[in-house]
Regions:
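FIC/Doc superfamily catalytic core
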Residues: 1-241, 245-309
Length: 309
């Protein structure tokens, strides 16, 4: 990894802004900004400081050549540190609420929801209503909360990821919103804003049966497996609505089953997320999506380890 990538990974892990990192390194904001924008190269003394901070933050004893390899190794170390991520979340009400809030707010906002994070919190945890917001948006928040609660309990029993679970999650998410909640679509759909062909509705049950079998196959590279499954699910687009939300819940089910923190895909990363997904679906290149998921899981670990950004 070059020094720019080391700094970027330090930022991602710690949540520190550029001012704070500059202070830690003993340089000006302007100097750090020049390094990050490839307009200058750190002097040898600062290269040593960057590497020292990188090793301190990551807990590694070396700097990896490849950024994605460094992130993957960091994830493995965090898995070893957190012996049971799911139980850790469930046994800590504040942490659990933060995951439910972050996952619900971001997932709904990615799909066009207009509730703020504070409004989402008030609806979910205090049963507040906002006259300026639609009843559907209120239901989307409460339903996503219910889906996560159901999912956490389901995973505690070490139950398999199967079609029954996928249909149940859709039923919960679309309860009171769509009449086809809990059923595969029986009509054609297209992915808005993407030139990606979706499956013929007649083939959906067969494709989902195959997908459910593949979800539970063991893989040496968990993140690669998750990226492939997520890409396939979203291209099948098995439901009339709610595919993105269900897909991200399945992604986090797979991650939690392998003792990873949930992937928190932030609304501000929406375009990058869609771009990575598009490359996986049209070019069969899952590497960008894998890297994106790695970053999103690291966001989840910030909640798990109480690092705020």
């Amino acid at each position: 990894m070059n020094y720019k990538e080391q700094i970027q990974l330090i930022q991602k892990i710690t949540g520190l802004n550029q001012d704070e990192i500059a202070n830690r390194l003993g340089v000006t904001f302007a100097a750090l900004n020049r390094w990050l924008n490839d307009k200058a190269v750190p002097r040898e003394s600062f290269k040593k400081k960057i590497t020292k901070l990188y090793i301190e933050v990551t807990g590694e004893d070396k700097v990896f050549e490849n950024l994605q390899e460094a992130k993957s190794n960091l994830l493995e170390n965090k898995k070893k540190k957190h012996k049971n991520v799911l139980k850790e979340i469930i046994s800590n009400p504040d942490m659990k609420d933060q995951f439910v809030l972050s996952l619900t707010y971001n997932s709904n906002t990615i799909e066009g929801g207009t509730l703020s994070e504070n409004e989402t919190r008030a609806i979910m945890f205090h049963n507040k209503t906002f006259p300026s917001k639609s009843m559907i948006e209120h239901l989307e928040a409460k339903n996503h909360q219910t889906a996560l609660e159901y999912l956490f309990s389901y995973l505690l029993d070490e139950s398999p990821i199967n079609e029954k679970l996928i249909l149940k999650l859709h039923e919960i998410l679309m309860n009171g919103i769509h009449s086809d909640a809990g059923f595969y679509r029986r009509h054609a759909v297209r992915i808005v804003g993407a030139n990606v062909p979706t499956a013929n509705h007649v083939k959906v049950p067969y494709l989902m049966e195959e997908l459910a079998e593949d979800i539970n196959k063991k893989s040496k590279d968990v993140v690669e497996h998750v990226a492939i499954i997520h890409s396939r699910f979203e291209q099948i687009h098995p439901f009339g609505d709610g595919n993105g939300r269900v897909g991200r819940l399945i992604m986090n089910t797979m991650l939690l089953k392998q003792n990873n923190a949930p992937a928190v895909i932030k609304q501000k990363e929406k375009q990058k997320y869609y771009s990575c997904l598009n490359k996986a679906q049209l070019r069969e290149d899952t590497v960008p999506l894998e890297d994106f998921i790695l970053d999103s899981v690291l966001e989840g670990y910030k909640i798990l380890e109480r690092v705020t950004s």
